[in-house]
Amino acid sequence: MRYGMSVPCFGEDPRMFGRLAREIEAAGWDGFFVWDHIRWRTHWPGGVLDPWILLSVAATTTSRIKLGTLVTPPARRRVAKLAKETVTLDRLSDGRLVLGVGLGWPPDVDFGWLGDEADNRVRAAIFEETMEALVGLWSAEPFSYHGDHIRIEEVQLRPGPLQQPRPPVWVGAKWPNRRPFVRAAQWDGIVPVMDTTKHDRALSPDDVRDLLELIGEQRGSLDGYEVVLGGRSEVGTEGAGRIAAFAEAGVTWWVEAIQPEGDWFAEAATRAGAGPSR
C-alpha cells in the first residue's frame, strides 16, 4: 500500500502548494495530487488555480513523491496542449507524473457555462479520442489521428515524456456503472468513487472486490494495476486498520482526500505532518 494526499486546486497563492508538497514528502507520504477545476460550485467564494502550475511548483520543492491530477477532464483540453503540459511536468519532476483522468464534474458550472461540452455521453466520446491521440503525441514520432472530434495530420511533438513508453494513467469512475470501468481497464489504474445518485454511501471493501472482478475480466490480469481509493483516515492504528481492510480487497493506493470545508488548507498541513496511517 502506498499513501498520498489530494487537495482542491483552490486558493490564491500557488506557493502554498509547494510548501504543502514538501511537508507531505518529508512526512513519508508517497504522492501529492490536486483537483482540476476551472470553476466548482455556483456560489463558491474562493479562488481556483491552475493544477499544472501548482504541480510544477510542487515538482520544484520535492524529489521523490508522485505528482498528478485527480482528475483532469481531457474532454475540455486541447490534446496538443495537454501533451505539452504533461511532458513538461514529467521532465521537470524527473519522471514522477501520474495523469489522473475522468469525465469531470459538475457538467454545468465547470463545462456548459464556459462553452464546453456538458453532455456526459458526448464528453465520454471526446475523452476516448483525446486519450488515444494523447498517447500518439507522447510517442514523439510523426502521428495522425482522424476521429469524430479530433483530427491530427502528421504532427510530431518533441520531446516525449521521460517515463517510457508513457506516464501512468489512472481513470476516475463511478461505481456501479459498468462502462467507465470497462474504459478504465485498458489503462494503468482506477480511481473509483460511489455513484451517490444510486447509493447513499461510500465504497466498501466488497465494492472494491466487485469492481476489480469486472476490470480483471477485461484485462485478464491485474498485475501492476493500481487501485486508488480516496477517503479520510484517523491518525494511528485505528486509521491503519480501516485502510488494511481495503488493502486486503485490492486497493494499492490510499489517498487522504481533503475537502474544501472550513480552514481546509491548515487541516491538510496538519494531516500531512502526522504522516500516513500505516
Describe the predicted segments one by one.
Residues M1-R278:
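Active-site-adjacent structural elements that line small-molecule/cofactor binding pockets in enzymes
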